[in-house]
Structure formats: structure tokens, C-alpha cells
Amino acid sequence: MKLISLLFKQISVVILIDSISTLPSDTEKLCYNSVIVLKLSWSLTLHIQIFMEVWQYGKFQWNDPFFNNDMDDVFNQLFRRMDNQNSEVRGISLMDNRCHRMSLLNTEQLASYPKIIKQWKYLKMVNRLLKKEGFIEKLGTNLTEQARDGLLDPVIDRENEIQKPAQKFCRRRKKNPLLVGESGVGKTAVVEGLAQRIVAGKVPETIQDKEIYSIDLSSLEAGTQYRGSFEENIKQLVEEVKAAGNIILFIDEIHQILGTGALAGEEVKGLADIIKPLLCHVAKLSVIGATTQDEYRNTILKNAALARRFNDVVINEPTAADTLRILQGIKELYEKHHHVVLPDDEKKAAVDYSIKYIHNRHLPDKAIDLIDDCGSFSGKNSQTDVETLDQRLKNKRQLRRPAIKSEDFAKAADIKRVDRGTKQKIKKTHQKEKITATIDDVAQSVERLTGIPVSDMGANDIEHLKNLDKRLKVMVIGEDEAVKMVAKAIRRNRAGFSEGDQPKGSFLFVGPTGVGKTELSQALALDMFGNENALFGIDMSEYADRTAVSKLIGTSAGYVGYEDNANTLTERVRRNPYSVILLDEIEKADPQVLTLLLQVMDDGRLTDGQGSVIDFRNTIIIMTSNAGFGNEALSGDKQRVQSLMDKLAPFFAQNFRPEFRNRLDNIVEFSHLTKQDLSQIVDLMLADVQKTLAKKSIKLEVTKAAKDWLMEQGYDEAMGARPLRRVIEQQIRDKVTDFYLDHLDVKNLKADLVDAEIVISAA
């Protein structure tokens, strides 16, 4: 009786105003015997369905003596009154069907009873209200129920992955599939897809009546501050699962069960210890779990007793073509949410960009994130009137609930009609305002997510590549041939005509000191990646020892510093895959370090000390060397015209093996600087001084005589431009500093040559 009362107390929340109908005599007697007065006007069909569900819950869940076997005859008689012509479905035993299934009526009969279809969502809401009394409803979410309500996203093109766990549930014992795969490959989506297939009946007969519940481990552990509370929760959960007989528990991040409920330093059983015996028994407990490859290896496999109770199902990353089909299947959800149109080329760009630029995540998750971010960016300028209509709709719904509770159904019906009109206005407004997302929006989404300046290969980018050498020549003086060789290699790679998976470029810069090898590297980083911080240099003199290899890839397992690899080459590339790597003075490194670089230059990847594969395909690797360009290179004209390979032959024979030389894109020779080159370098260095002074609103004018004197003092063919930098530091920066400290109010300065000395004065 309590159950019947509870039903009619709760049903007032979900009542659907309908035509008044007369109850059959059997039903009237049943209601009056239950001391329930039906004041609500429902259709006959709704009454029959509700009483059928009450009977099933009362008989199987609560064992109420009111619900006896004679009720079968009552309901069969009621169904015959509904449709005397077709009674095939009446013979279906109500005891063999769960209250949540519509299998009592076939498709033709559903078409004959449109009110059943219209009111079915309200019946399901009643079921949920009844089942909320159960402990399992407090711990998790019924994915199968969500699938019936259409609350789950469609699962596209994952049939093989869904059928594998479905087949595992057909076993007699150990019906516990464990989904193992990297994060983002769709493990949870496979479980949701299984729930959808159960609702659609596209699973083996053994599991067609199953309910999948996603369990929240934190809810299971919450409030268990007293000894035995946690075990009591587990016991109650297991008892409900056994009593239902058709529940599958889904535990995401299932490796956490090894620590859930266990107290440090105390002999208390955890969740894994308690459910472990139940997992291998017949018809005791069915669990489907999900975890990553690393967690599976480090936790589950180490517990052999737990591992043998699961059947692992590997979920691999979908291909680019599969991901594109997934995006095609879910695009309507994101178009509706963001009020934008997502064309096919935009989805194709999302897949391509996610593969090319987002390396530490997996498909399809990263491609879906790009679509979502792109949609939010494209539809960010929503009109205010849409928000006003949404707010009006919410306010009307709030007024509708009190009207239903007070049984003012006329007012509730009026509010519902207003709701329909408001929804139509919102729909029309959205249709007018829909914006079409573009490939540029996807590129901007990639830039927001990764910080990488991404642009499509359009006209602007082509011009940018064509003029690369011109821009570099402005910043690197006197090395036109070197700049030209580097620009050719970069253009070839960016245009997509390079073969293999090599880095964007791998160069060996050779030449005397101070001629611009490092300067060209900095200019290249600024031009290619828009930031000088994209260049990180490594002084290879620190790698003269063979054991220093760990500084590049991290310490191996079992050695000190295994967990701390933040400053290694591989970690820095993982965090910033678009960068210029400068290996300065490569000839000073141990040959073992050079051997390590072979894989980088050939395959564009390197495995670090922890076993992770780092992608180097988007880096530019530059090695510098002074070998063959010492002071002896200036001793005579014969050596001046000596070929590059002749100069490098002794060095290569000693340090570089043939396979290393063959993997270089180019060996770039830098020549000695002339006085004419140095005159242009003076202007560049003085421009840097001007930038520094501009921070204090100071302007400096340098006369031609002063520039010529600085060039003469700083010229050294053997040493390059570095002596000139020291001269400017001493003669300009230091003297400007002294003058500024004595004359704080002077903002316009002048540097002139007086008696063979630089003098700073007010302009």
C-alpha cells in the first residue's frame, strides 16, 4: 500500500493533462481497496501502464503480498479491452519483462496508441522516482536509462570495440571486461555505446535486459568516517545488484579500487579486496572497467589475483578517417549547442590539425575538443534577444510547477502554450543567426590550445615563405649564402615536399667564431615561430662525458632523478614541440651523444628515459662548430680558397661517422666578415642600444665619425663581430650610463668623436 501511495504522490509532478476517461471496474476496485481516490484525469492507457509498473515493482522488489499472481489475469484482461483484435502481445508474461521496457507493445500497436508514445517519458520519470529509493541510484548513474531518454551522445563507428565487451558478458564466469587504452581514445564512449545497443536490442540475448550503472567511487567512500561504514556501503550495493539480477557496474579509472576504502597503516580491506571473490562467481557481480595502459600495467597487473578476474579489451586510437566519421555523426549536437554551422572542410581541418599540432593527446578526443572550441569561438557573439527569450522561458517554467502542485491545471496548460510559442521564437532566431565556422577558426582554436601560430597554406603564407631569406638577411649580415641554403630547406619542408618524418630542418653551421651562427638561429626562431623564446640552446661542452646522455633524455629507471626530468631536451620539446634546438659547439660532445641524435634526424622522434616517444618533426635542429676555422685558416691565401669539405675532413674523420653526415640537410659554411659587413652590423647593434634607451624615453644620435671609429676599433677578421659588441658596450652603453646619472632630466643625447674618443653630450 505504501508503494501505491508513493506512486500517486510523486505522479502529480509529472501529470500530463489529458481527456477525462472512465476507469474500468477492476481498476476502480483495486484503487478503492488501496484507499486511493483518483482525482486526476488520465487516459485509460496511462492507468494500465502505471498499474502494470506498480505491480512489477511491488512483486519483485518489495515482495508486497498485495501483488499476487492473480494480477497477471487482471492486466491481461485490461489489455484485451484496449485491443480485442490483436492479442498476440497479451500473452507475453509480465513476469519476464522489466518495467522500463516497451516490449509489451510492438511497432504497429504503438502507432495505434499515440498517447502511449506521448506519455512514455512521464512514465519513465515515475520509474526513476521509485528507483531513487535504492542505494545504487545514490552512487551512480543509469547509463541505459540515459540512453533511452536520448541523453547520451551518439557513438559512431565503434562497432568492433562495443561488440568485444558485449561478448565477454556472455561468458558463464568472470564476465568482467576491462577496457584498456590511452586517455581520450573513447573508452567511456564504448560503454555508452553498449548501453545504446542494449536499448536498441542490438546485443546478444544474454544481456538484452541489462542495466549499466556508472559508479562514483567517491560517493561510495563518502561519509564512512566510522569503522565498518565503508564495508556496509559495499555490502548494501552488492545486495541490491544481486537482487536486481540485471545490473552491470561500470567503474571508470578502475585502478582506483585498489586504494579505495583502505586506511594507511591499518589492516582494513579495500574495495578491491571485498569484491574480488564476487567477480569470478557465476551470477554474482558483473563489472566493466576502464583504465589507461600505464595504470593497468602499474596497478592491475601487479595484483595477479585481481587481474585474472578481468578480461582485458584493448581500445586503440581510431584512425583519421574513423575520427572524421565520428565528427560527422556528432556535428549536429555541437551545431545546436553553439548555433553555428560546421561544414565538412572544417571538420577535416580539425582532424588534420589535431594530428599535426596536438601531440600529447589522442584521437578522437583532441579533434572533438577542436570542434567544440571552434564552435564556441565562432558563435561567441550571440544576440541579446535570444538570452532574453531563454530567461523568459525559465521564468515561465518556474511558474508552472506551483500551478501543477496546486492542481490549477488550466493555468498550467496556459503556461505550457506560452512555452511552445517562446521555443518557436528561439528556434527562428537561432536559424537566422547561425554562423558558418571556417578553417581559420580551427587554426585559431589550435593556437589557443597549444600556443602554436597556425595558419593555412594560403597566399599570405606562401609570400611569407618566399621572402624568408630576404628577412633573414636583414638580421644576419654578410652570410647571404648560408641564409639562402637554410631558407631553401625550410621552404621545402613547409610546402610539404620533404620526404619522411624528419625535423623541419637539420643543419650544421661551420665557420669562424663571431660571424653570426647563433644570430641566424635566433632570427630563424623569431621568423618561423614568432618568438625568440622558441630557441633553446645547449652548450655541448657540458656533454663531453658519456654519462651526460641522461641530461638529454632523462635518467633511466632505478637511478637518482628518474622522476625529475623537467630540464631535459626531450621534456622541453614535449612541452614546446615548435622550437629551434641549438647544439652549440657540437665537436665538444661525446660521440655517444651524436649517436643519440641519429634517430632524431632520421625519424623525427626520440624515446626518453621513461619510455615516452617525443616528436621532433616540428623542430629545427641547428648544430654549430668552429672546427677547421682556427687562426691557422688565416695564415695564407691557399687556405683561404680551400674547399669546405677539405677544411672539415680531419674533424669529420675524428668525430662524425658517415651515417651522421648523411642525415644532415645541409652543411652551411659561414665566411669571415669584411669591414663593409661590419659597418652594417654597427647599425644593428646601435639599434639595440636605442631600444634599451627608449624604455626611459631617451633618444641617442650617433654621428658617422663615431660609427666609423667604433667599426675600426671593433674589427678583427679572426674574431668576427664579438669584439665590436664589446667596444659598443664600453664606449656607448657605459658612457651613456655615466651621463644619465649626472643629467637625469636630459632625454636627447648625442655620441660624437672628439680627439679619438667617444663623447656623450646633450643633443
UniProtKB/Swiss-Prot annotation:
Chain positions covered by the region annotation I: 136-386
Residue numbers binding ATP: 181-188, 511-518
GO molecular function: ATP binding; ATP hydrolysis activity
GO CC term, one of those recorded: cytoplasm
Disulfide bridge map: none
PROSITE patterns: CLPAB_2
Keyword Repeat attached: yes
Keyword tags: ATP-binding, Chaperone, Nucleotide-binding, Plasmid, Repeat
Record keyword ATP-binding present: yes
SUPFAM superfamilies, A to Z: P-loop containing nucleoside triphosphate hydrolases
Domain of life: Bacteria
Residue segments, region II: 437-629
GO annotation terms (biological process): cellular response to heat
Signal peptide from the UniProt entry: none
Family of the protein in this entry: Belongs to the ClpA/ClpB family.
Protein's job: Could be the ATP-dependent specificity component of an ATP-dependent protease.
Identification of the protein by name: ATP-dependent Clp protease ATP-binding subunit ClpL
Phylogenetic classification of the source organism: Bacteria, Bacillati, Bacillota, Bacilli, Lactobacillales
